[in-house]
Amino acid sequence: SPKKYIINPKSEKHDLNLLPRPARHLVNMEGYFKIGAFQSAKARSNRVLSVMCSRGCPEKCTFCTTPQMWGSNVRWRTTENIKAEVSEDVKAFNIGEIQFLDDTLTVNKKNLFSLCDYLEKVGLPWCTPNGTKVNYHLRTQSEMYQRMADSGCYQITLACESGNQRVLDNLINKRLDLESVYPAIERAKKAGMLVHT
């Protein structure tokens, strides 16, 4: 008889706080630190903790699998949940820097600022190597970038993907007006952050 394949429907994990934390104690973290596996180009330390605060992305860029993998609704862990992971692992592994690998770390300013309040107390440098959407919160972008910098963010990656508006509009469906890129770069630099695009 022919084989039958059943593909179950995808389900999103709605409450990220219910997910177990990464079991870093089971991994040879010293080996990763030694080879610089978690570093961005301008890392302040080779002892980097990679963290994800959220899942999902409302954008529909043709090259990206995030909406298919995590869904289009952005779901955040609570600051308390993030704090528990970071506090424990910073101490356990003598961490010198935190890198947030979220696809849309800046989409929700309330959650971002709550995270910044906590990170300011931690006192470690941090960055966003995966990229942040350039045109979120344009009217309050200066305030947002300054808050990030004040809490220890030394480098922001702006996800431009292309310097050609036709490519952005017609090939990769990246909803981005290139006219917003240079002002965003200037705002981030004025806040004291390095900028990667």
Residues of each region from the PLM?
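Glycine-rich beta-alpha loop elements in corrinoid/cobalamin-binding modules
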Residues: 1-20
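Radical SAM [4Fe-4S] cluster-binding motif and immediate context
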Residues: 24-196
